[in-house]
Amino acid sequence: MAIQKKHGKGRLDKWYKLAKEKGYRARAAFKLIQLNKKYGFLEKSKVLLDLCAAPGSWCQVAAEVMPVSSLIVGVDLAPIKPIPKVITFQSDITTEKCRATIRQHLKTWKADTVLHDGAPNVGTAWVQDSFNQAELTLQAMKLATEFLVEGGTFVTKVFRSKDYNSMLWVFNQLFKKVEATKPPSSRNVSAEIFVVCRGFKAPKRIDPKFLDPRAVFAELADPTPNNEAKVYKPEIKKRKRDGYEEGDYTQYKELPAYEFIQSTDPIAILGSTNRLSLEQSKNGDVALAVLEKLPETTDEIRTCCADLKVLGRKEFKLLLKWRLAVREKLGFPTKKSVKKEEEAAAAVAAAEEVAKIESMDEEMRIQHELEKLKERNSTKKKRERRKENERKQKDIVRMQMHMVAPMDIGVEQAGPEGEDAMFALRAVEKGDVMRRLAKGKMVVASEADAKKDRDSGIGSSGETDDESDEELDRLETELDDMYDQFRERKAASDAKYRAKKARQARNGDGDEEWEGVSDNEKADEISDDSELEEESSGDSDDEDDTAPRKSLLTDLDTTPSDNSGLSKRARAFFNQDIFKELDGDMDEPMDEELRAALAGEDEDADMEDTVSKADSKKTKEKTADKKAAKKAKKAAQKAQQVKDDDSDDESDGGFEVVKSGKEDDWEDEDKRTKDGRLDIDIITAEAMTLAHQLATGQKSSHDVIDDGFNKHAFKDREGLPEWFLDDETKHDKPQKPITKAAAAAIKEKMRAFNARPIKKVREAKGRKKMKAAQRLEKLKKKSDLLVNEEGMTEKEKAESIAKLLRKATKKKPKQAVKVVVAKGANRGIKGRPQGIKGRYKIVDPRMKKEMRALKRVAQKAKKRR
């Protein structure tokens, strides 16, 4: 009998003929060739595993393209004729025997690429065939996960079906890149596509459900329809075109109205039904006749029941109310009736419980009450704990949103000076309360006296009008600080502003960061729980006034204070070992002017320390310490001078102590140049205009001083908020005239300033000069060695030195740009191509055509000229 060939349309196409010409066993060989041309995975593979390889065309392509001495293993259920450089055997890939045979051939190797082009026996129902194909692909995937190396490639054939997305999800979990493609040699009428999975993740453990067809291809249950959204929000309802329901191809549902009345889920009926029928057929149901005759069934209800799909929220509510009214009239259970029944049942149960409790003995009753009290107490504690946690959470959120200062949360916590503190000792000592407490004769004030105190300006918590004013001042200060923080955050995105702040930080004149509310400010708040009155006589008052005042706060610094006039910081400085030798001399009588100078300097240091606490504690304290140390050192030097000059004379005469000038003089000295002139740079057109006028004699220094006295010079800015001052600074400022020559000079100055090279360029030039100097130094050392070499003639020495000079001055050849054509393995590549070092440029035919077109256009434009 003659062999029958398939002569269907598209079977004997050009790929079939090319396969015959080139000696491939099947036209499927060109599918692998085209896939490799696009992704280039065969050239990089040393070990390849081909599953379902019969008749062997993919193994033939792999043997041709892969490097020499590569290991290629092919397996199929059908026999495969021998192929050069390929190991083939016959087995079922779903069995353990096949897995053991593959492991025997690969030994310790791992496969770089796993191919799968298999298909099961088909011919039954299409749904079953597609599932069998997906199951076979999953089995191949299971085999690939065992033998594939990390970063390997898996290429498989997949038939598009409802299980395709589930399989693609599994691929994405195990591989870094997953792409689905259809090569040109694949027939268009075929549902097959090829999935190329690259970059195997090689997890240490894989969940068996990933490779179990029952778990991967399990059908998910349909979600419960949201009928409430259809009823209460019909305007935002979106239609999902999922096809028709099984057996319902008209998509039209009609139900009798009495089913809607009797249903326990009326919303589901309203969301899924098109019409509620009130029409009664001959010999029909009596319930519909009753509904029709009820007074609640109005014409509007009949109209709404005619078409439910066009109703809105209001009409649906009307139908639900109509249903409740009808159910109540017909005697059906409603929410009200059910609630009444539950209340009655609860009352009966409570009565029975009361009867049972009364029968208990006394001990049981007491125990029951104790348990109730414990339960109530634990409930109360839980509630308080929850409120406290909520308050803390709100504080943290406020701090994260920059609504409060970070120190606010710390101040609010329980502590010696916080809100939850039991005693405010500083406040007690500060006021007149401590003197009254020392007497011990106090009683609780009456309500009438408390009312008098409130009328006189003292609140229930002992807070007077002055304290309320202090509270307002504190709130204003906090508001100004919050405004400063807001301005900082708003201007932080401006590059000029950041540069300005950096300059200020380098110069040391930047604003310090606000560190929150001080504890000393919180100590002024007094909260008394009861009002006290004194019962002592006037005589005792007089006696107590003369008594020394006692303090509740103990100073931890127990260092005895001396009457030398020195502050604590200065005294601690003079206690160092370097000044011990001066102790004997210091006991001698010192000049009164010198003592006054030292005392004045210490007072200045203390005053600076007090001011520094209001602004910024840390930075100012360091500055004050340095200044105090300098002044103390100068005072010690002066004292030593006095001792040297007048060692025999103990009188107060002989020299005059002159106090040092202001700090501004020192600052001016820092700003002066080496030749004594002030370091001033003119950077604005107004300053340049004034400089021209002073230089040309148009203005004198007295004129400049007179111009300084204007309406802007004596503005009272004390007490004004910061936001108001910012607005005034922007808009209310004097407009000084400028000349054209001054503007041109500033412009030329800025042009020269901008023409300077950037910092990177200057650094590069500096590095270049430094390297050249280093090479020259090495060259000098080598030339000195050659000159001192005795075994060489003068000519040889000169030639060697000239050779060194040529080698040192020789420039490195510029590396040429390598051109890489974007085709084959380099098509669509991202990053550096493999095997390319140095500079490169990727080109393609499209770019070549565009370059030719540009040259052609340029030549045409040149001819027109």
UniProtKB/Swiss-Prot annotation:
This is AdoMet-dependent rRNA methyltransferase SPB1. It comes from Pyricularia oryzae (strain 70-15 / ATCC MYA-4617 / FGSC 8958). GO terms for biological process: maturation of 5.8S rRNA from tricistronic rRNA transcript (SSU-rRNA, 5.8S rRNA, LSU-rRNA); maturation of LSU-rRNA from tricistronic rRNA transcript (SSU-rRNA, 5.8S rRNA, LSU-rRNA). Residues 556-566 have a biased composition (Polar residues). It holds the Pfam family Spb1_C. It comes from the Eukaryota. GO terms for cellular component: nucleolus; preribosome, large subunit precursor. It is found in: Nucleus, Nucleolus. The keyword rRNA-binding does not apply.
